[in-house]
Amino acid sequence: TLSSSSAASDVYKRQQYASAERVDVVGPKKTLTGVSILGPVRSATQVELSLTDARSIGVTAPVRESGDIAGSGACKLVGPAGEVELTEGVIAAKRHIHMTPADAEEYGVKDKDVVSVKVDTDGRSLIFGDVVVRVSDKYALAMHIDTDESNAAGCGRAQMGEIVK
């Protein structure tokens, strides 16, 4: 999974990581350089971009859950070992919360629930709707939003939110 989000270096899933290597994502309009590679290796290559980044390079990025790449956008990836054309795989990640089973019990939610999350910020407070709950003992509690969403609410790196269902 690739991510253009500024939070890509803050990978909150346990047993997952941001690689030191970077790639360029090439679209018809321009190129995003130095995009993070997130691991471990998955069964199919997936590129997660903010809608702003996707639009700026001229690619389609439907809002999807991770792994749901059938019929999604195309791009070219260029890295130190060469390049590859992807016929699909570009998405804008659907906002979601990772949590452990104990967290889910505490917050009264279960895997795949869809909730809303209220964030109170200085002058830009808002409620994020359509937030998918993902529960696994491999996760650490964190909400994952992209740079566009974070900027819209004026979120800082350690922004707290409240599930309002």
Which residue ranges define each predicted feature?
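Ordered, amphipathic secondary-structure segments that act as subunit-interaction surfaces
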Residues: 32-80, 84
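Composition-driven recognition of glycine/serine/threonine/acidic- and proline-rich low-complexity segments
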Residues: 15, 22-30, 38-42
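Short, small-residue-biased leader/transition segments that mark boundaries at the very start
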Residues: 2-12
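Conserved "landmark" site that anchors the functional core of diverse proteins
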Residues: 1, 16-17, 29-32, 60-67, ...
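Extended, positively charged loop/linker patches that create polyanion-binding surfaces
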Residues: 61-119
